[in-house]
Curated annotation (Swiss-Prot):
Gene3D superfamilies: Cyclin-like (1.10.472.10). Its main location: cytoplasm. GO terms for cellular component: cell division site; cyclin-dependent protein kinase holoenzyme complex; cytosol; mitotic spindle pole body; nucleus. One of its GO terms (molecular function) is protein kinase binding. It holds the Pfam family Cyclin. InterPro entries: Cyclin_P/U, Cyclin_PHO80-like. Residues 211-231 are annotated as: Disordered. It comes from Schizosaccharomyces pombe (strain 972 / ATCC 24843) (Fission yeast). The lineage of its organism: Eukaryota, Fungi, Dikarya, Ascomycota, Taphrinomycotina. It is found in: Cytoplasm; Nucleus. Forms a cyclin-CDK complex with pef1. The gene is psl1. This is PHO85 cyclin-like protein psl1. Keywords: Cyclin, Cytoplasm, Nucleus. Belongs to the cyclin family. PHO80 subfamily.
Length: 243
């Protein structure tokens, strides 16, 4: 059962006092913590599922544009926690709340696009995050940084980020548009879930070993046409979500 369905139909979330996340003013560090808690619990769940069903398999190197699990998988689980990774991204590549929240929605779309055969796990979550953030920053922001900066902040080679970003676009059907209503719905849902499930979370604050990036001048983004409006499924990483 999807997280969104669980929350929307539970008695605790049908009261008149509904949770509301103010996108423009919500504390960014708190938002990153909420996203991190959800993704950390999701990846642990999927890790255990894969260990039970694929105990004899190991992550493979990127070899195919058809399988995001292969393309985004690292050889080893990164030593930096999800929350520390997102905090690092925010520090060196500042962005608004809608950019970070949109990455969660894009991951949901990818999972749904591949008919729930994609596992968001500890081997691929960091690469999904940096690729999604790179794409979302260019779509939502008037200014953005070069891919060389995003790659350095993310701790991966530039050529690999370029490949991951293109794959991220492909897996989202080159459609990154998200309506304000859908952003708000996901934000409210995430806040509600966190207040019920995330209070006992203690993240492992592991610092990243790569050196701090140097300053780069942001590039202005020029959009000539309006993107088409997608049909939103409104499920948070539905295939393996946790309630």
């Amino acid at each position: 059962m999807s997280l969104a369905f669980t929350l929307l139909t539970s008695k605790d979330n049908t009261d008149e006092d509904e949770e509301h996340l103010e996108l423009s003013s919500f504390n960014q560090e708190k938002l990153l913590e909420m996203i991190s808690v959800f993704l950390s619990r999701l990846t642990r769940l999927n890790d255990s599922k894969q260990e039970a069903t694929e105990s004899d398999q190991i992550p493979l190197s990127p070899t195919s544009l058809k399988n995001p699990c292969l393309i985004f998988s690292a050889k080893n689980v990164p030593s930096i926690s999800i929350q520390a990774y997102l905090t690092r991204i925010l520090k060196y590549c500042p962005a608004t709340n809608d950019v970070f929240l949109s990455v969660l929605i894009y991951l949901d779309r990818i999972v749904h696009h591949f008919h729930f055969t994609v596992f968001i796990n500890s081997f691929n979550i960091h690469r999904f995050l940096i690729a999604g953030f790179t794409a979302a920053s260019k779509f939502f922001s008037d200014v953005f940084y070069t891919n060389s900066r995003y790659a350095k902040v993310g701790g991966i080679p530039l050529h690999e980020l370029n490949h991951l970003e293109l794959s991220f676009f492909v897996f989202n059907d080159f459609n990154l548009f998200i309506s304000l209503e859908d952003l708000q719905a996901y934000g409210d849902l995430l806040l509600s879930w966190y207040r019920q499930n995330g209070q006992n979370y203690n993240p492992t604050d592991v610092s990243c070993s790569i050196e701090s990036p140097i300053s780069h001048t942001p590039q202005q983004n020029q959009q000539d046409e309006q993107p088409r409006r997608p049909i939103m499924d409104r499920r948070l990483l539905s295939s393996h979500s946790i309630g």
